[in-house]
């Protein structure tokens, strides 16, 4: 833990000062550690830092840095909420199959299946969670009394809301069918994870491919997926097959590395680049498909980690194409997928816009900080740039949504 000597430096200024590219570069050049670089308490005696002496300037720079950092934190929290909403929808529709359970219960109890499904979709009908199984399905289905109360509660909704729910409800079947996954909605399919999209592995690069020449594109490895581009990122101008090119909005899956921290699905918003091996680029034909595959990989993460851990050597594990062909998921018919997209795509797009804003704010903060420290830019000028760049309406819209 580091505490500022407030007789010499303002407490809000210490963090941005230590995080500045100048200080970080000086720390890196000290070559502390061998296999695992580290910076000890005693090393601070060798670290010399230049900074403005006036406390009011220090405070202004610190406040500016923290204000942008708080916006970044807010967007991350909003994205946690949005992802939670999307995953809850996925769990209900594609794992527990709540809309189908509601319709089946209504048929058995002589109630209106569509109205029962509407009640489930609106959250007014509570259904026991869990995958449907022949020996437990009856217990999971709502009672006649629960159906009656939930259907009656639909009257509290506006006609527009009821029409929207009815449009969605009509795309769900009234019963289940047996499959290799167990019970899934009638008309749906059991599909191998590998067949839910086109998974294209990245290219293999050698040290001879790297260059700092102008016009070179970054090579995107797992480190870049987690932290963005850095001074450790490698670049190349070599000819690379077009299928390995990635751009903003592409969906990527890291299938090799430390299972607990590396196996993850990512949305890429770091600009144009070349994809490194051990990462899949996920190609889809529709946005509905992209959102569903994103959520499937989120949902299957624990299972994929378990698979990788069983093959773990020297701390690393991986998921193979063969594994993805063995692992199956329930895939909806076209009408249900379209209905899902009408709800999930706006959430997905808002989530993506927050990632873009996070990246933009972080780049702005880290670009302006050295200029503030050197006096090249005043805090007032930096704040004006930040105000002009920040996308406030989207942030407020997301805050309202959450």
Can you say where each PLM-predicted feature lies in the sequence?
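Internal, well-ordered alpha/beta segment that forms a basic, Gly-enriched binding/recognition surface
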Residues: 86-94, 101, 105-116, 121
């Amino acid at each position: 833990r580091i505490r500022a000597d407030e007789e010499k430096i303002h407490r809000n200024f210490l963090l941005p000062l230590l995080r500045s590219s100048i200080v970080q570069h000086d720390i890196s050049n000290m070559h502390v550690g061998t296999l695992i670089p580290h910076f000890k308490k005693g090393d601070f005696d060798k670290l010399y830092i230049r900074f403005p002496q006036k406390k009011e300037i220090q405070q202004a720079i610190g406040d500016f840095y923290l204000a942008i950092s708080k916006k970044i934190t807010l967007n991350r929290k909003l994205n946690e909420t949005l992802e939670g909403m999307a995953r809850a929808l996925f769990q209900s529709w594609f794992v527990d199959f709540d809309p189908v359970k509601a319709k089946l219960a209504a048929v058995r109890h002589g109630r209106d299946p569509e109205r029962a499904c509407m009640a489930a979709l609106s959250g007014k009908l509570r259904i026991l969670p869990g995958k449907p199984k022949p020996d437990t399905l009856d217990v999971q289905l709502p009672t006649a009394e629960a159906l009656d109360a939930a259907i009656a509660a639909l009257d509290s909704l506006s006609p527009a809301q009821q029409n929207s729910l009815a449009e969605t409800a009509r795309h769900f079947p009234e019963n289940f069918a047996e499959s290799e996954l167990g019970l899934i909605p009638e008309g749906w399919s059991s599909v191998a994870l590998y067949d839910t999209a086109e998974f294209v592995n990245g290219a293999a690069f050698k040290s001879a491919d790297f260059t700092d020449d102008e016009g070179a594109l970054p090579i995107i490895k797992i480190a870049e997926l987690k932290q963005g581009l850095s001074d450790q990122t490698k670049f190349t101008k070599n000819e690379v097959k077009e299928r390995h090119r990635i751009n903003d909005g592409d969906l990527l899956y890291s299938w090799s590395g430390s299972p607990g921290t590396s196996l993850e699905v990512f949305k890429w918003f770091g600009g144009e680049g070349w994809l490194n091996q051990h990462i899949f680029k996920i190609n889809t034909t529709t946005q509905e498909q992209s959102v569903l595959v994103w959520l499937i990989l989120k949902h299957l993460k624990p299972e994929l980690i378990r698979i990788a851990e069983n093959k773990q050597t020297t701390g690393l594990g991986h998921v193979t194409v063969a594994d993805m062909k063995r692992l199956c998921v329930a895939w909806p018919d076209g009408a249900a997928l379209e209905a899902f997209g009408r709800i999930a795509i706006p959430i997905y797009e808002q989530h993506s816009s927050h990632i873009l804003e996070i990246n933009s704010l972080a780049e702005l903060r880290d670009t302006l900080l050295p200029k503030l420290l050197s006096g090249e830019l005043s805090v007032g000028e930096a704040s004006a740039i930040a105000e002009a760049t920040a996308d406030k309406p989207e942030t407020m819209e997301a805050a309202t949504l959450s």
